[in-house]
């Protein structure tokens, strides 16, 4: 479950995806630290400065990722090859980033307090065409962890039982 907590790279990616200004992103980081502290990774829960600086670092990295990735072999050589490159050159963010982004959008960024989408669209975010038991189990874990409720035509629904083309409404409860 540790992968479900907000990390600096996650927040930087969300800020980048929503194209927030520096002031808006600073306000967002502060709101998350003050109001959503329980969802932050352990290393950030009691250290706003570390959270802020790490998110800024990763935001800068995302702005010029191609250049940083080109320079990484030289940096690795200078450090004697001891740096772990998985966080730097990996283009695949965690699948749970979708739910982190959804929760943050609903609470802090968007004007609406709900998001609607088809289950088929949600599956395509993960690269699936059909729902599997494992996917539904993971989906339910994320929904429960982030306190996100799903409803269909105003009634609470179970994502395992609805049709792929049903329009689901997501809300933070």
Regions found by a protein language model. Name each.
Residues 97-113:
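Short helix->loop/beta-hairpin flanking segments within DNA-binding domains
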Residues 109-130:
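Short glycine-rich, basic-tinged beta-strand/loop micro-motifs
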